[in-house]
A protein has these predicted regions:
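Conserved short alpha-helical segments that host acidic/polar catalytic motifs at enzyme active sites
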Residues: 1-203, 208-267, 273, 361
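Flexible loop/turn segments at secondary-structure boundaries
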Residues: 65-66, 96, 168-169, 190-191, ...
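Generic beta-strand/beta-sheet core signal
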Residues: 89, 154, 162-163, 174, ...
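Secondary-structure transition/capping motifs at alpha-helix termini
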Residues: 109, 130, 264-268, 286-293, ...
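A conserved beta-strand->alpha-helix junction
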Residues: 113, 118-121, 292-303, 400-418
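Phosphate/diphosphate-binding loops
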Residues: 140, 188-189, 196-197, 204-205, ...
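PRPP-dependent phosphoribosyltransferase catalytic core
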Residues: 142, 157, 194-200, 352-454
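Short, glycine/charge-rich flexible loops or terminal/linker lids adjacent to PRPP-binding catalytic cores
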Residues: 289-334, 345, 372-378, 382
Length: 454
């Protein structure tokens, strides 16, 4: 069972690179390993062989949006309580985490982490003490949670999967040839472990997997408008995944085709920034008739810069990660496609790489609108202060990053990426589906003693 979880984590490594963990359930006895690092750094062959065979497992690769990058914040989180035990893995971000944690602490709760996942674990545990089953406890807990959460919860006898009522973050499940059920954030992980995709877990749904098979419950949260994160299609998800019936690859190609119409330019070649800019670049090239060219070689052994903790690390990683191909770039007018500009740091260095390689012109096109507002639902941008589009015009940003021109995907065209208007685009327009918190920083539970109560 640990091997299956391990390969699934490998397929989802792009979603989080800070830490990872696996918990295996061997007839009610939990065995676990969690640590900071990539999947191949945390788990050796010997580590995997030490796990019992087990009947169930939960695994997680972390991209922190609440709480720092510490070993204590590694997931899955394990809890022992009066009625048993559980292991919990969570993707998303609770928008009412501060209020919930304050309430729990006033009631005597002692927290061992600074992540919002432990808050979920506490609330489920409280509910479990007064509930006939773990699924009833989770259902009760979900009525108190606000924001984004796709989670998997393992008890001694059951595996539960749940998605928040808005469906912010993806979650799906499949089945292997031997009858093993597999739940994952993306369908690409199902393919990686040989599981056939069954369906996406619906917003507000709890699925219960046990010895009797699988059953569904959606009677607890009420109907909410679907608000899937549009940034999943633009950046987070792997291109070979299908989320809520929409191909990520197709959505990105659509973005490129739209950009070719809304921001045309005379150029010799279209190039994409690896990896999430490539599909949009193919769409731009196909729609515009400008040839697509390979402009960069990517170092496969370094992580994604946008989701790496700390700005200083991001600056160092860009040049190590990407190298421009001079033969493709020299004396060319280039349309450069990337998925987003958040802080501007990465874009400036990428444009500079092309200039150093001899590019005549660099026209940057972005397959998303300007990032104007913080995200409270699982993207690590917690302040307008860090968003370049909040402080500069498009022309000024082009000058700052060194591009000859700059064009963003119009917000009005987002619906044409996925053929629906049922998405959250609050990071672009400030329209939040849920109440937003007063305290938003990622490290809000980690302040020094001298900084508290100010």
């Amino acid at each position: 069972m640990a091997d299956l979880a391990y390969y699934g984590l490998y397929a989802l490594q792009h979603r989080g690179q800070e830490s990872c963990g696996i918990v295996v359930n061997d007839d009610g006895v939990f065995a676990s390993r969690k640590d900071i690092g990539l999947v191949n750094e945390v788990f050796s062959r010997d580590d995997l062989m030490k796990f019992p065979q087990g009947r169930m497992a939960v695994a997680h690769a972390r991209y922190g949006t609440t709480g720092g990058n510490s070993r204590a914040n590694c997931q899955p989180i394990e809890v022992n309580h009066q009625k048993g035990k559980m292991a919990l893995a969570h993707n998303g971000n609770l928008s009412n985490a501060y209020e919930l944690r304050s309430e729990l602490e006033l009631g005597g709760a002692i927290f061992h982490t600074t992540s919002d996942t432990e808050i979920i674990a506490y609330i489920v545990t409280q509910a479990r003490l007064n509930s006939p089953s773990i699924e009833n406890a989770l259902s009760s807990a979900m009525s108190r949670l606000e924001g984004a959460y796709s989670l998997v919860l393992m008890s001694a006898a059951k595996l539960l999967a749940a998605r928040d009522p808005y469906g912010f973050r993806p979650l799906c499940y499949g089945k292997t040839l031997d009858g093993t059920y597999v739940v994952a954030s993306e369908s690409c992980a199902l393919s990686a472990v040989g599981a056939k995709f069954e369906r996406d877990i619906l917003p507000g749904e709890i699925l219960v997997f046990d010895e009797n098979g699988v059953r569904s419950n959606r009677d607890h949260c009420g109907e909410k408008p679907r608000r899937s994160c549009i940034f999943e299609y633009i950046y987070f998800a792997r291109p070979d995944s299908v989320i809520d019936g929409v191909s990520v690859h197709a959505a990105r190609r659509n973005a490129g085709a739209i950009l070719s119409k809304t921001h045309p330019v005379e150029a010799d070649v279209v190039m994409g920034v690896p990896d999430s800019g490539i599909d949009a670049a193919l769409g731009y090239a196909e729609a515009s008739g400008i040839p697509y060219g390979m402009g960069f070689i990517k170092n496969k052994y370094i992580g994604r810069t946008f989701i790496s903790p700390g700005q200083d690390k991001r600056i160092d990683q860009v040049r190590i990660k990407l190298s421009a191909i001079s033969e493709s770039v020299k004396d060319k007018r280039i349309v450069l496609i990337d998925d987003s500009i958040v802080r501007g740091t990465t874009s400036r260095q990428i444009v500079n790489l092309l200039r150093e390689a001899g590019a005549k012109e660099v026209h940057m096109r972005i397959s998303s609108p300007p990032f104007m507002h913080p995200c409270y639902y699982g993207t690590d941008v917690d302040s307008r202060e860090n968003l370049i589009a909040c402080h500069h015009s498009v022309e000024e940003i082009a000058d700052i990053i060194g591009a000859d021109s700059l064009g963003y995907l119009p917000e009005s065209e987002l619906k044409n990426l996925i053929g629906s208007e049922n998405f959250c685009s609050a990071c672009f327009n400030g329209v939040y589906p849920t109440p937003i918190p007063d305290v938003i920083t990622k490290d809000r539970f980690e302040g020094k003693l001298s900084e508290r109560n100010k």
